[in-house]
Amino acid sequence: MMAFEQIPKKDWYSILGADPSASVSDLKQKYQKLILMYHPDKQSADAPAGSVEECIQKFIEIDQAWKILGNEETKKEYDLQRHEDDLRNMGPVDARIYLEEMSWNEDDHSFSLSCRCGGKYSVSKDEAEEVTLISCDTCSLIIELLHYC
């Protein structure tokens, strides 16, 4: 599935000091500024050993953050995983639905399902393959999207 499942959960955006809505060029600027600041070659030779090790660890984290957020594909996967984690933290799954049970909307190329509150669950065709949790656009209910094997 996603490469992020093996990596301990880290907020790569906060490591770069960026907002999740930041553009790739903004992320790159923050990365470049931080990577220079924490680069091992830029550290003072007379700095305490613990301080140097902390800088090296921070340098590695900044580099990892950029490798994930600087690549369009891995950034998309990471953002989807963050979104699903946020939904999981909102509460339990209300129902498990197969994609085939949802209605296809040709106008906006999305699948949708009515919620018991009158709102709807919707997911684009592209997202349908990747997301597993969908929130109602009106209330706090969440469904789990299942796929036939």
Curated annotation (Swiss-Prot):
GO-annotated cellular components: cytoplasm; cytoskeleton
Entry binding sites for Zn(2+): C115, C117, C136, C139
Keyword rRNA-binding: no
One GO process term, biological-process aspect: protein histidyl modification to diphthamide
Gene3D superfamilies: DnaJ domain (1.10.287.110), DPH Zinc finger (3.10.660.10)
Pathway membership, UniProt: Protein modification; peptidyl-diphthamide biosynthesis
GO molecular function (one): ferrous iron binding
Protein localization: Cytoplasm, Cytoskeleton
One protein family per Pfam: Zn_ribbon_CSL
Keyword list, A-Z: Cytoplasm, Cytoskeleton, Electron transport, Iron, Metal-binding, Transport, Zinc
Domain (DPH-type MB) ranges: 93-148
Domain annotation J: ranges: 11-82
InterPro entries named among the record's database cross-references: DnaJ_domain (IPR001623), DPH_MB_dom (IPR007872), DPH_MB_sf (IPR036671), J_dom_sf (IPR036869)
Family matches, as SMART domains: DnaJ
Family: Belongs to the DPH4 family.
Domain notes: The DPH-type metal-binding (MB) domain can bind either zinc or iron ions.
The protein's assembly and partners: Monomer and homooligomer. Iron binding promotes oligomerization.
PANTHER family, sorted: DNAJ HOMOLOG SUBFAMILY C MEMBER 24 (PTHR45255:SF1)
Function: Stimulates the ATPase activity of several Hsp70-type chaperones. This ability is enhanced by iron-binding. The iron-bound form is redox-active and can function as electron carrier. Plays a role in the diphthamide biosynthesis, a post-translational modification of histidine which occurs in translation elongation factor 2 (EEF2).
Protein's UniProt name: DnaJ homolog subfamily C member 24
Organism of provenance: Bos taurus (Bovine)
Name of encoding gene: DNAJC24
